[in-house]
């Protein structure tokens, strides 16, 4: 299913090329996670605030997209599509969003210093659930 989705990203008539990458709308259910767990808050913003996942999910459920103009980065591995943005993907899935903006990226486009989970993923780590589900950790770590 992921490989078919990826070719749809590549070949879609409504896809938009962004540099070497392709921007497209997809159902978040077709994208897998790259980790077993995620923090219950997003990373610190420029004002020092760590937004809770539940706030983003609540906004999405009311039709407000707090991630406007920030497509989910996806890449292919073993015929499946995986996300480099697990917390945002989780938020969309939990809110029941049917279509999200994704951008297909290559491994070379990912900043491994900021995305250690992606580096580990490419070193043959694979989520226990094969990327189908993810656990939300409680606490501020």
Give short role names for the model-derived ranges.
Residues 1-81, 86-141:
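Compositionally biased, low-complexity segments of secreted and virulence-associated proteins
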């Amino acid at each position: 299913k992921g490989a078919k989705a990826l070719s749809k990203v590549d070949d879609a008539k409504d896809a938009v090329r962004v540099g070497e990458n392709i921007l497209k709308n997809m159902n978040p259910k077709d994208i897998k996670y790259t980790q077993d767990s995620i923090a219950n808050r997003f990373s610190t913003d420029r004002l020092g605030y760590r937004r809770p996942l539940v706030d983003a999910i609540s906004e999405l459920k009311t039709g407000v997209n707090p991630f406007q103009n920030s497509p989910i980065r996806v890449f292919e591995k073993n015929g499946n599509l995986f996300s480099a943005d697990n917390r945002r993907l989780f938020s969309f899935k939990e809110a029941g969003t049917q279509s999200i903006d994704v951008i297909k990226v290559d491994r070379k486009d990912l900043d491994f210093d900021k995305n250690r989970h992606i580096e580990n993923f490419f070193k043959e780590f694979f989520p226990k659930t094969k990327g189908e589900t993810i656990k939300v950790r409680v606490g501020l770590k």
